[in-house]
Amino acid sequence: MLRKGSCKPGSWGSFWAILALVGLVTRAAQRADVGGEAAGTAINHSHMLLQRLQDLLRQGNASDVILRVQAVGTDEVRAFHTHRLLLGLHSELFRELLSNQSEVMLRESRDCAAVFDKFIRYLYCGELTVLLAQAIPLHRLATKYRVASLQRGVADYMRAHLAGGVGPAVGWYHYAVSTGDEALRESCLQFLAWNLSAVAGSAEWGAVSPELLAQLLQRSDLVLQDELELFHALEAWLGRARPPPTVAERALRAIRYPMIPPAQLFQLQARSAALARHGPAVADLLLQAYQFHAASPLHYAKFFHVNGSAFLPRNYLAPAWGAPWVINNPARDDRSTSFQTQLGPSGHDAGRRITWNVLFSPRWLPVSLRPVYADAAGTALPAARPEDGRPRLVVTPASSGGDAAGVSFQKTVLVGARHQGRLLVRHAYSFHQSSEEAGDFLAHADLQRRNSEYLVENALHLHLIVKPVYHTLIRTPS
């Protein structure tokens, strides 16, 4: 065991010399072992090295630095007998901190102190096991001590495990904002948008900040039952958070009232505590919604613009906007189905429906990959294998007519994944308005594999949504 105290000027050089000598001896031994064999044969004993490093950390042999970690607000102190060389290899901050002292007191928050042993283990072995609740404190430690590889690793873990539960997504979003991690912030925001119904029904909904709420309310890709569900979720948030009146009124004005049927609007005006308190702030929007429902969209568009966000549906799961489709054994063969949606959200079109036909093909081959004949004898070039194809989904109207004048249809397909008994949205694919299919639909999915992330009990869970998009009429001179 080395003595505690300031490191000697030659200690780093001696340590590196020892490592270099070990490397030369190991290399010579490997050459001797493979003396008569072909060049390039490798012997990999890296797992033995990892085991030695674990033993070194656990036993504290030849340690030259003691880290004492105290949890803030407690008297609890944990001591770690470590080696400045190994700590300094990963962290420039540790290299500076330990350059002239052999014992350091570190003060960390309670959650960071609780995982400090995992953090130190990573510096020795380059690996650790992470739980959801440990992600933020580990990322904080990696950021504080400038361990870039662990920062990236934990951030990747958080993005990959957002579907592990709606609770972490809210906390992780706020953490990403505080640290400036834009990639993690956007991943959390996307997960929350796609699974808003689950988020709004959880205890974490009250922890949503006004800034996050504003970000969500302005999005058109929110997945929820209907706009009325969003209003009730907002009203519940207002009751818990009790924000200033300006924040509450701004949030209430983000609701898309034309997407709510008139009968439900009447009930909201009569029973909603939020509208009773802030009704004057949204009176113009309610009047706009009633006017929209009272006239045909074509007539309304002659006097008002209908291409604003208030007239654009979100991703509603209600039957009027689409239908679920569960495809068992999706890799087996082609499937087809049909469903109906309402012509538009206007009350004037409440009884008018459009029928849509859907075709799913698990192994569709583009023309460029299909077998062709190249010579006069009719000899075929090698045919493309079935696995060379990609999944394809085509959505077409059963008939066309004048009912859709002034409106186009935006199609969206949601792909669900089950986690801990819940079905969450894992992916969403949007079609171009002029297209009948999404070009990248399940482009990287392996439907042959039963444990594919896209499958739930060997079934593909889709939800097909068709959103009418209104266009402002172009007036022509008479």
From Swiss-Prot:
Residues 63-132 form the BTB domain. InterPro entries: BACK (IPR011705), BTB-POZ/Galectin-3-binding (IPR051481), BTB/POZ_dom (IPR000210), SKP1/BTB/POZ_sf (IPR011333), TRAF_BTBD17 (IPR056184). It is found in: Secreted. The keyword Signal applies. Residues 169-269 form the BACK domain. One of its GO terms (cellular component) is extracellular region. PANTHER family: BTB_POZ DOMAIN-CONTAINING PROTEIN 17 (PTHR24410:SF12), HL07962P-RELATED (PTHR24410). This is BTB/POZ domain-containing protein 17. The lineage of its organism: Eukaryota, Metazoa, Chordata, Craniata, Vertebrata. The gene is Btbd17.
